[in-house]
Structure formats: C-alpha cells, structure tokens
Amino acid sequence: MYKGLLKQYASYLPVNEKTPDVSLMEGNTPLIPLLNISKQLGVQLYGKYEGANPTGSFKDRGMVMAVAKAKEEGSEAIICASTGNTSASAAAYAARLGMKCIIVIPEGKIAHGKLAQAVAYGAEIISIEGNFDDALKAVRNIAAEEPITLVNSVNPYRIEGQKTAAFEICDQLQNAPDVLAIPVGNAGNITAYWKGFCEYEKEKGYKKPRIHGFEAEGAAAIVKGHVIEEPETIATAIRIGNPASWSYAVEAAEQSHGEIDMVSDEEILHAYRLLAKTEGVFAEPGSNASLAGVIKHVESGKIKKGETVVAVLTGNGLKDPDIAISSNQLDIASVSNDIEQIKDHIKGVIMS
C-alpha cells in the first residue's frame, strides 16, 4: 500500500528518525495519456495531473516535506505568501501537525476556490495591498526576525519534496520523456523537476529531458529579462513578476538544452478549453501554460514530431471556478417539466 511521499522516496529525501511521519497521501498522481491532443500535434503527449494531490495542486509535494522539517526542528508556526495554492497546502499540513499557519495574500488577487481551502483548514489570513512579490517580501522579513518558519519555495525543503514528481514520471514511463513542459511562476517547481531528473539519472541511468518552461506573457519576467512590477494574467497561479528561483530556473533550462518562453492569456485559455473538452481533464488556467507552450513549440518546430512530451498540469480546475464559467459560453437550456419536451430537446442535441 502507498504510504505517502516521505515513505515512498525516503532514500532520496532529508528524512530521519526525528522527522514526523506525516502524509495526506500526496504524490502518486496519474500520468494521463492525452490521446486526442497527441494525434492533433503528432507527439506522444502525457499530462502529469498534479490536481489529484490532496489539496488539488503540486504544492503538497513540497509542503509535506517543509512542514515536517519545521515541526522536527521545533517550530510551532509556519508562514507563507500565496496567490492561492501554497496557502491551501500550507494550511492543510499545518492542521495535520497541529501547527499555526499564517498566510499573507495580495488583496483581491486570489481565486476564491483556493482561499476557501485555507479558511476551511483554519489558517490565519492577512490581506495586504500590493501583489505577490510584495507579500513574499513581507513574509521573508518576518520569518527572519520571528520564531516562525517560512514555507514558500525559497525554503529548500520545498524543492526536495517537489523533485519527487520527476521520479514518478520516470517510474511511470520507465524512462524520462524527451521534453518536460512546465508552467513557471515563482520558478521553484522547474528547479525541483530538474534536480529530480538529475538525481534519477545518476541513480538509475535514465536520460534527462529538455525542460521547456512557460511563463504567462503578462508576468514573463525571465523571458523579458526584467522584473514585472505589476504582473497581470488570467493564470493567477503564475501571476508573479519577480520569481524567487529565477536564476535556478534559467540554469535548469540551459543545462537541459531547453528554454523558458512565454504564452499569452489567449493561448492559455485555448489550451484550457481544449484539454477539458477533448480529453476530459480539468486543470486550472496556470496549469495550461504548459500545454499552451507545447502547442506553440510543436508548431515552431522546437518540439519534434514523434517526441515523448510530459506537460505538468499543476492544479485542479476546481481551484478557479470563476474562469471556467467566464471563459466558456454557459448555455443552459430552459425546458418545461414535460418528459416529451425534454426528450425532444435531447434528440436535437444528439443530432446536431
């Protein structure tokens, strides 16, 4: 029986006899063959569906490690800045270990589905003026001066936990893919995947993939080469204008012979709808930066026909239900409560 990440990959993680045995059964997420989109693009495309994690995003991988180590080291409280997914994950694992969780969010810039999770898990939530980068600056200063552990991706234990997704992909494919496509926000995850692939190459002899990272155009600090003071994109999970792991992300792309590129909101929304309507997979907008990037790079020839590609789908579509409604035409038929009229309407739908 699967026992969670800290047990599954203990030999690759900084755990010892003092590390709390904590898990919400994070990890072990499906690698879904995206058969219909594969046919359209001429590649072997898979989606690593991180929305299947306990709080609905990849953050659980790093958070179980970071919060467990915080508890091991005697901390009774954790703090983070968040656009949503980090807050949900931090609050869940803090609740599991009986710790206090303080979350600082940018006012009015967090999806309701994510905020609802943090509230349900009992976190203390503080809203401040500004954007995510302002919130991160604040919590870094507080954690440096107060007895509270910072659990944003600048915490190295987060990277240790998140690298396990690379292990899983290799285990599921029995090799690494040719290309890993991944959204880039604060840039911790791309860093973690590269670390994981490098470790598995040394341990098991698997090849390393080319890493293609994708920022949202309105928050593409790395691609544009400068901090974006007021980042704006429909993809709230990657609406970050000054990535904390900027240099590590660039290293991952360069060392893997990949690149970091950007995709527009229009490309993200196209991928978002395509994934749901042709594959039955519902991932939040930020997740679809990876798929949008795959489409862009196949069309430009940067991803070759026939290559094996894994697109990391970082979060569940239920995280941001407002976008699901606003980006699709909500056409609800109004029919009287008469069985024949209902049947006639259904026949019309089937025949259309």
From Swiss-Prot:
State the reactions this protein catalyses.
O-phospho-L-homoserine + H2O = L-threonine + phosphate
Pathway assignment reads: Amino-acid biosynthesis; L-threonine biosynthesis; L-threonine from L-aspartate: step 5/5
* EC number(s) on file: 4.2.3.1
Keywords linked to the UniProt accession: Amino-acid biosynthesis, Lyase, Pyridoxal phosphate, Threonine biosynthesis
Q: Which InterPro entries match?
A: Ser/Thr_Dehydratase (IPR050147), Ser/Thr_deHydtase_PyrdxlP-BS (IPR000634), Thr_synthase-like (IPR004450), Thr_Synthase_bac/arc (IPR026260), TrpB-like_PALP (IPR001926), TrpB-like_PALP_sf (IPR036052)
Q: Which family does it belong to?
A: Belongs to the threonine synthase family.
What is the designated name of this protein?
Threonine synthase
- Organism lineage string: Bacteria, Bacillati, Bacillota, Bacilli, Bacillales
* Gene expressing this chain: thrC
